[in-house]
């Protein structure tokens, strides 16, 4: 069992006694903690492509509008973000940041054409999707447009460096964890073109 505000929980069915009971709660200590709800959203970019993402409002924020952290997933081709519990998102939210995750072109689960649309486009169309989705969240008035950062790992780490280069007016900070920076190697070995 998993939702967006409780840690993963696994159940065990006892056939002899016909009972269902807890087998494992991954982070039982956070069950009572006030966590933030993650809401799905849709956005149509300037190319007319519908993108899906997830927005988590800042928890415990006092002020006019919270800052935003954009959290692009790795890949880029095939992986995707899902609705559900994400410890990174909850940590950021409880620190007072709203968080946006976007399934850019090339993300899995949206059909072959959507997947292919991201192939060979790690520095262009995929970054365009991330940037335009960020602008879309700002236009909704949910966050402070002057306090936007981006943080990611693997290909998300590449995006966390690329976005502030492409749009320094929009992204005030970028944090890259194990970022993918040798795109030529990744093309040769399969990651970017999948």
PLM feature segments, named:
Residues 1-194:
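Serine-hydrolase catalytic core recognition
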């Amino acid at each position: 069992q998993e939702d967006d505000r409780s840690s993963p929980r696994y159940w065990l069915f006892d056939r002899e006694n016909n009972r269902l009971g807890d087998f494992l709660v991954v982070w039982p200590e956070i069950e009572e903690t006030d966590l933030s709800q993650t809401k799905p959203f849709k956005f149509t970019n300037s190319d007319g492509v519908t993108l899906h993402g997830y927005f988590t409002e800042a928890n415990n924020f006092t002020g006019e509008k919270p800052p935003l952290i954009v959290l692009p997933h790795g890949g880029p081709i095939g992986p995707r973000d899902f609705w559900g519990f994400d410890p990174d998102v909850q940590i950021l939210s409880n620190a007072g940041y709203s968080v946006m995750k976007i399934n850019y072109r090339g993300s899995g689960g949206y059909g072959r054409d959507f997947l292919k649309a991201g192939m060979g486009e790690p520095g262009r169309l995929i970054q365009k999707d991330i940037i335009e989705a960020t602008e879309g969240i700002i236009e909704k008035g949910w966050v402070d447009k002057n306090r936007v950062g981006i943080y990611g790992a693997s290909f998300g780490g590449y995006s966390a460096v690329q976005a502030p280069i492409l749009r320094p007016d929009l992204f005030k900070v970028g944090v890259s964890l194990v970022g993918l920076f040798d795109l030529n190697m990744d093309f040769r070995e399969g990651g970017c073109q999948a």
